[in-house]
Structure formats: structure tokens, C-alpha cells
């Protein structure tokens, strides 16, 4: 599926809110930068507990007439590193946000093959955020388990295995 319709055409009278999530190393930050380049306001690493406050503020602006569908769309990066993260809690929050008038909430999930993620972590000499004292493969397995419900409700799943981060644009 192509991401183009999801990125460029908000429904009438709705402000577009893209939630970008997925596995560490799959390119979330690069995707947010690319979205910023095409006019999105980008927020990265938003703690899950702050999501309703940020999006609720956008909805309040729209309700008061200060913002409309022509306003700058926003892309929000959220991953499982947030304190107290729960995939089920994330899914429940998204379901609730999707009922918010004047907002079009779309979830994009970035995925990647384990071998490619391991190579990316090795090349950058970074540890996996969920396995600071264990191997990268352990962190990836733990993260896949945590993110399983999120991936299942995504409007679009993008596999970045064959794409260098620079190609996410």
C-alpha cells in the first residue's frame, strides 16, 4: 500500500495527526524528519501519557475554530522506551483518539527484519534500548512482543528492511 494518500489529503474539517511507531532501528526518527520536510510539525519520543494532552489540545483548537483541516498536520513519534509503556494501553488511547471530532488520527508502524535491525545496531555501535545489558536480538524480541498489539491496529505497516534510512523520504 502506498503511504501517499495517508500523508497528503486530510479529510474535510479534520486536522491530520500521524502517529509514527515501530521497532527501534526501523527508521522512526528518519521518517519524522522526512514528514517535517513536507510540512508536518514533528514531535519525537513523546511519552505515551502525554499523547492525550497534546492531541486533546489540538482538538480543543479545532473545536474553538482556531484550527481547521488546513492547519499544519502533526506527526508524533512514540515507541516502547517510554516509562510504563504498554502496547495495549497505546492501542486503547489510539482507539479513543480516533473518536475525537476534527482530528484524523492515522497510525503508521515501521517494521524491519531482525537481521537488518541487528546489523543497524552493530553499525552504529548502539545498544538496543530494551536490552542495555543483553544482546540486541533479546531487545528486538522483547520489543516485538510489547509492540504486537500496536502493529495489529496500524493503518499502514512499512517494512524498512530493504531501505536505507536516507531512503525513508
Task: Identify the meaning behind each predicted range.
Residues 1-16, 51-64:
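Extreme N-terminal, non-catalytic leader segments
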Residues 13-18, 71-74:
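Pre-Walker A (Motif I) flank of P-loop NTPase domains
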Residues 38, 70-73, 101-106, 152-155:
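Short glycine-/polar-rich loops that comprise or flank the Walker A/P-loop
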Residues 84-87, 114-121, 129, 147, ...:
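Switch/connector loops and helix/strand junctions flanking conserved nucleotide-binding motifs
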Residues 101-125, 158-161:
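Conserved phosphate-donor/acceptor-positioning beta-strand/loop module used by diverse small-molecule
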Residues 130-168:
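Small-molecule kinase domains that catalyze NTP-dependent phosphoryl transfer to phosphate-bearing small molecules
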Amino acid at each position: 500500500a502506498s503511504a501517499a494518500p495517508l500523508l497528503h489529503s486530510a479529510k474535510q474539517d479534520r486536522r491530520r495527526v500521524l502517529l509514527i511507531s515501530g521497532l527501534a532501528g526501523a527508521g522512526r526518527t528518519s521518517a519524522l524528519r522526512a514528514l517535517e520536510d513536507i510540512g508536518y510539525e514533528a514531535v519525537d519520543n513523546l511519552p505515551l501519557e502525554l499523547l492525550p494532552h497534546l492531541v486533546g489540545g489540538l482538538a480543543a483548537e479545532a473545536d474553538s475554530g482556531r484550527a481547521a483541516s488546513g492547519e499544519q498536520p502533526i506527526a508524533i513519534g512514540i515507541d516502547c522506551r517510554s516509562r510504563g509503556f504498554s502496547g495495549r494501553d497505546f492501542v486503547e488511547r489510539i482507539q479513543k483518539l480516533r473518536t475525537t471530532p476534527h482530528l484524523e488520527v492515522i497510525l503508521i508502524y515501521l517494521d524491519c527484519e531482525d537481521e537488518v535491525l541487528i546489523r543497524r545496531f552493530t553499525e552504529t555501535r548502539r545498544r538496543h534500548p530494551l536490552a542495555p545489558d543483553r544482546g540486541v536480538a533479546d531487545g528486538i524480541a522483547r520489543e516485538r512482543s510489547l509492540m504486537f498489539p500496536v502493529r495489529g491496529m496500524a493503518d499502514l505497516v512499512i517494512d524498512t528492511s530493504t531501505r536505507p534510512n536516507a531512503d525513508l523520504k
